[in-house]
Amino acid sequence: MSRRHVCPVWVGYLLANPVRALFQDPKKILGPHIAPGMRVLDIGCAMGFFSLPLARLVGPGGRVICVDLQQTMLDSLARRARRAHLLDRIEIRRCDADSLCITEFHGQIHFALLFAVIHEVDIAARLFTEVRDALRPGGRVVFAEPKGPIPRHAFDESVSVAEHSGLRKIDGLRIPWSHAALLET
């Protein structure tokens, strides 16, 4: 997707640090929304802070499609997934500046995670539309942005863009240090 600012690789290492799970525990955040066997999208996956726990949650019959713009981040994710014996549950995809490159998943995805990614793209509507198109009817999205650099009004504007793209907000979520919402097709 077009980018305003892309997360530097060195920040990816900080974001993947296991200490982060003390404050933003992926199982607590995502567990209520994931069931074994699901097909899940992790958009802007970076080095896999959420991807690996998602792979555990979907189990051997599920699949996590991990999408990022930066090959270095994806290479790190692949190494981490291999070490965790989860690579068989993860599909790693590099998107480009104009597309998430996920059209073949049209109507097949149960759940998508958009965590700290919208502020990095120029055209949020395009990203939300591609995610909506990939989701099955009733598919859900956890959408979150960091509170520090992203003011509340900017997050609310992004939720409005998501709603204009065909998603609807069904709930607010409480995620430490984040503005967050649960969206649905």
Can you say where each PLM-predicted feature lies in the sequence?
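Class I SAM-dependent methyltransferase SAM/SAH-binding core
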Residues: 41, 47, 52-99
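Class I SAM-dependent methyltransferase Rossmann-like catalytic core
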Residues: 4-23
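Conserved alpha-helix/loop element of class I SAM-dependent methyltransferases that forms part
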Residues: 20-38
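A short SAM/SAH-binding and catalytic strip from SAM-dependent methyltransferases
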Residues: 109-122
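A short glycine-rich, Lys/Arg-flanked "PGG" loop and its adjoining helix->strand segment in the class I
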Residues: 125-137
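A short acidic, Gly/Pro-enriched loop at the edge of an enzyme's catalytic core
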Residues: 38, 98-112
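Core SAM-dependent methyltransferase catalytic element
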Residues: 174-185
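Conserved beta-strand signature within the Rossmann-like core of class I S-adenosyl-L-methionine
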Residues: 138-145
